[in-house]
């Protein structure tokens, strides 16, 4: 059974305007990424580049570049910080795939399947080391504080997710706490470091951080909806991976809490006890459809997307502001 995501029409938004506006800086970021994955240890660039060159949108570093431009920053530090943000993101993906025992990432075989769990973890650690090295080279204490704090929060989020895995009693607030830490924190930091380099006032920094935080929450909500309603070829992973891995995401939280006693027993067996049988994924999709769990997840994503857009309301109109607003619309309207 397929769940149809509640988008009124094909996604009209795109990242094209943002991509075009930051293209010159992004070329420099990509060159930095390529240079910093280099190592005399041959396995390091092999593992790192397997994921880095696999077609990710580079959204987080683009946000760093765009926000630096929005803040009027005229130096070069944002290039290394954008590369550091991408390395932090890539490291979390390498680590996540080990924790989740994932077989696919971005439509390719996960690095852990080719080089093993140990190599994936250690190369992730290498990328984090390179990220911190670039932060230090930029020599801006505030930017270093923002990104290093984010690294700690992200790790906390990963541990928090371990605590909610297979726990069907997880409530919506607990779920949101996990995704704020695990996903949205890096979006927030990516959006804050550019204005920090430009020495903007606290109110402006807070607005940029709010934009990133709420965009990150919306982004993860859509990812969680797509895991049950998307298509494998476009998702870059198998539909239902979250179900098979026992992850308690918002579609599950809503379905469990709105369900009957027998339906809750189903969730306790499949996710709580990891006893998944043939036909259980279809049953899960059926229950989500019955309780409008997918469409309500998307509705919440729209809510957080609106908060992100409103965060920049006092910023004067510009091409870069319009591109950031369109990026929000794209992230929410991803019709995979």
Where are these regions (language model features)?
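All-alpha prenyltransferase/terpene-synthase fold signal
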Residues: 1-336
């Amino acid at each position: 059974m397929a769940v149809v995501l509640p988008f009124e029409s094909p996604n009209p938004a795109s990242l094209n305007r943002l991509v075009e506006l930051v293209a010159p800086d992004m070329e420099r970021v990509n060159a930095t990424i390529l240079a910093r994955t280099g190592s005399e240890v041959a396995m390091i660039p092999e593992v790192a580049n397997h994921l880095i060159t696999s077609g990710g949108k580079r959204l987080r570093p683009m946000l760093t570049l765009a926000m630096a431009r929005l803040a009027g920053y005229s130096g070069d530090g944002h290039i290394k910080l954008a590369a550091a943000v991408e390395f932090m993101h890539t490291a979390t993906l390498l680590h996540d795939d080990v924790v989740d025992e994932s077989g696919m990432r971005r439509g390719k075989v996960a690095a852990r399947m080719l080089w093993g769990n140990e190599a994936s973890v250690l190369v992730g650690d290498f990328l984090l080391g390179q990220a911190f090295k670039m932060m230090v080279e930029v020599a801006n204490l505030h930017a270093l504080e923002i990104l290093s704090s984010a690294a700690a929060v992200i790790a906390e989020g990963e541990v928090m997710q371990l605590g909610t895995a297979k726990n069907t009693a997880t409530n919506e607030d607990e779920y949101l706490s996990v995704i704020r830490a695990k996903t949205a924190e890096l979006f927030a930091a990516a959006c804050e470091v550019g204005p920090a380099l430009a020495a903007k006032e606290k109110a402006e920094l807070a607005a940029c951080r709010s934009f990133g935080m709420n965009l990150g929450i919306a982004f993860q909500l859509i990812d969680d909806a797509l895991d049950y309603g998307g298509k494998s070829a476009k998702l870059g992973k198998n539909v239902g991976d979250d179900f098979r891995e026992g992850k308690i995401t918002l579609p599950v939280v809503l379905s469990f809490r709105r369900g009957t006693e027998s339906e809750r027993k189903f969730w306790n067996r499949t996710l709580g006890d990891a006893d998944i049988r043939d036909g259980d994924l279809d049953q899960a999709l059926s229950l989500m459809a019955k309780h409008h769990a997918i469409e309500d997840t998307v509705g919440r994503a729209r809510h957080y997307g609106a908060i992100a857009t409103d965060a920049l309301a006092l910023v004067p109109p510009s091409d870069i502001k319009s591109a950031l607003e369109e990026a929000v619309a794209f992230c929410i309207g991803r019709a995979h």
